[in-house]
A protein has these predicted regions:
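Pyridoxal 5′-phosphate
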Residues: 1-398
Length: 398
């Protein structure tokens, strides 16, 4: 293996050197507990608030609407469970989609077991929510709509502003899982009518184990973790100061270079998509062709098993994914690909490649050249492909 090409940035990203540098003093020098009264430690409370300011500015929020959590799944659980509890006297119905991250889907299932009713919306063949279906699903008892900003597997961007407008027209709270979108797309919580938003530091070159929860002023939401008075009595536990500094620094970095960075990612992504679709037969792009995350490409290859494809790519130093990193150990096909209408056998042959700003077109050439050989080799060993080719030849002879 001569080189390593990391193309799984939807799973996690490399922590930026400047982020690590900003964090280091808070492990060994400025290690005080922000809740302590002496100045050595209390200074860290101001540092935490500075990170809140930076993140709030990035999404058009107020500083006191930003809460720090343990990650995206933590924030998603908080949004659903504690909103459901707080508004149970108003209603017991929640609307989400069939293509959400499992942090949402499994939490929704948890709530169903506790008496809440959940509608799981279908999506179209590109993975987009159909707004008419959303409107039709609303009931007098609907208290929350939760739709991800952009899908972690196929990259499709949802009509978030329109969904938020529909929610607010009906007096319903709107939560969005923006774990993949934060740092990749401009977000304004007021323009999009967002009441709650989840994000995770390690998806935009920050550290793992630290997340963000935006909660609009006036939204009633119960405490998720009970104990001390941290995070304005809504999330107990001594603050992860190094992590908070890290996620704040990463957010500032992402905001500063977003336009230039994502323009490059989009150009390289389109180069990848064009080469794969033009040079590898019996292949399809999953997700919307243009309304997709700048760094996301997701393909399905007929007559190829995704796990074998990943192993062969790994042998060439290419890191990719067959779906969400949180479910990659499962032998079941992606619930997202099934939801957009793919048959099981095609969904099983999926490959997600997600870029970063360091990936160049020359790297894509290496990837595609190897991918062509690997797909051809795997198909040679497939009896299904052999039968398909025989039928094609027989049909051509008629």
């Amino acid at each position: 293996m001569s080189k390593l090409l990391y193309l799984d940035n939807a799973a996690t990203t490399k922590t930026a050197p400047e982020v690590v540098e900003a964090m280091l003093p808070y492990f060994t020098e400025k290690f005080g507990n922000p809740s302590s009264v002496y100045s050595f430690a209390a200074a860290n409370k101001e540092v935490i608030n500075q990170q809140r300011d930076a993140i709030a500015e990035m999404i058009g929020a107020k500083s006191n609407e930003i809460y720090f959590t343990g990650g995206g799944s933590d924030s998603d659980n908080w949004a659903l469970k504690c909103t459901a509890e707080a508004y149970a006297n108003k209603g017991n119905h929640i609307i989400t989609t069939k293509i959400e991250h499992h942090a949402i889907l499994h939490t929704a299932e948890y709530l169903e077991k506790r008496g809440f009713e959940v509608t799981y919306l279908d999506v179209d063949e590109d993975g987009k929510v159909k707004l008419d279906d959303l409107k039709a699903a609303i009931r007098p008892t609907t208290i929350l709509i939760s739709v991800m900003f952009a899908n972690n597997e196929i990259g499709t961007i949802q009509p978030i502003k329109e969904i938020g407008e529909i929610a607010h027209e009906h007096g319903i709270l709107f939560h969005t899982d923006a774990v993949q979108a934060f740092g990749q797309l401009p977000i304004n919580v007021d323009e999009c009518h967002i009441d709650m938003l989840s994000a995770s530091g390690h998806k935009f070159n920050g550290p793992k184990g630290i997340g963000i929860m935006y909660i609009r002023t006036g939204v009633k939401i119960r405490s998720f973790i009970h104990g001390g008075a941290q995070e304005r009595k809504r999330r107990a536990g001594t603050e992860n100061v190094p992590g908070i500094v890290g996620i704040g620094t990463a957010a500032k970095r992402a905001a500063a270079n977003m336009e230039e960075r994502t323009a490059k990612e989009r150009e390289v992504r389109d180069y990848l998509i064009d080469r794969v679709l033009n040079e590898i037969p019996y292949c399809r792009l999953n997700g919307h062709r243009t309304d997709r995350l700048p760094n996301n490409a997701n393909f399905s290859f007929q007559f190829v098993e995704g796990e074998s494809l990943l192993i062969k790519l790994d042998m060439k130093g290419i890191c990719g994914s067959s779906g969400s990193a949180c479910t990659s150990g499962s032998l079941d096909p992606s619930h997202v690909l099934l939801a957009i209408g793919l048959p099981h056998e095609i969904a099983h042959g999926s490959l997600r490649l997600t870029l970063n700003e360091e990936i160049e077109k020359e790297d894509i050439d290496y990837v595609v050249d190897n991918l062509k050989e690997i797909v051809a080799h795997l198909r040679e060993m497939s009896p299904l492909y052999e039968d398909f080719i025989k039928k094609q030849k027989k049909h051509g002879e008629k």
